[in-house]
């Protein structure tokens, strides 16, 4: 996944504070809740006709109703996102925060899209490949997409490896069109 510079700065700032305060998992959960609130109420939260302090209070009221406890630092973080019109980046902030946690532990997130569920043996082969390439232990996020026909698409460290039948067919079609054009 690509992250905006804005999202990565906010995520990294919160991560550094969370690590210092020993609240990384707490802030991770709070970010996910904030993301859910944003996804459900984005029209209201992005409405610039509503004062920022009212939008902040709206989020805090929802968290209070859900009996979600947060500290002053996270309250200020919410305020900062809304006042600076950055709440729209919350999903990227969450992803980068999660990525930073894994990276700090010496792990690497790997997105795998497969035509069918991976067997343990296939997962082990992919694990060894990624580990050899990055010198870090992979953490897989596997998605099944039967439109791939067969094979896998592996995404990690900004690279994409497509070894699917669908991908090969698209390459063949592209090559034929390029020759004819």
Swiss-Prot record:
GO molecular function terms noted in the UniProt entry: proton-transporting ATP synthase activity, rotational mechanism
Keyword Membrane applies: yes
Entry coiled-coil feature ranges: none
Subcellular location: Cell inner membrane
Topology of this chain in the membrane: Peripheral membrane protein
Keywords in alphabetical order: ATP synthesis, Cell inner membrane, Cell membrane, CF(1), Hydrogen ion transport, Ion transport, Membrane, Transport
Keyword Secreted: no
Matching PANTHER family: ATP SYNTHASE DELTA CHAIN (PTHR11910)
Family: Belongs to the ATPase delta chain family.
Function in brief: F(1)F(0) ATP synthase produces ATP from ADP in the presence of a proton or sodium gradient. F-type ATPases consist of two structural domains, F(1) containing the extramembraneous catalytic core and F(0) containing the membrane proton channel, linked together by a central stalk and a peripheral stalk. During catalysis, ATP synthesis in the catalytic domain of F(1) is coupled via a rotary mechanism of the central stalk subunits to proton translocation.
Quaternary data: F-type ATPases have 2 components, F(1) - the catalytic core - and F(0) - the membrane proton channel. F(1) has five subunits: alpha(3), beta(3), gamma(1), delta(1), epsilon(1). F(0) has three main subunits: a(1), b(2) and c(10-14). The alpha and beta chains form an alternating ring which encloses part of the gamma chain. F(1) is attached to F(0) by a central stalk formed by the gamma and epsilon chains, while a peripheral stalk is formed by the delta and b chains.
Name listed for the protein in its UniProt record: ATP synthase subunit delta
Source organism of the structure: Fervidobacterium nodosum (strain ATCC 35602 / DSM 5306 / Rt17-B1)
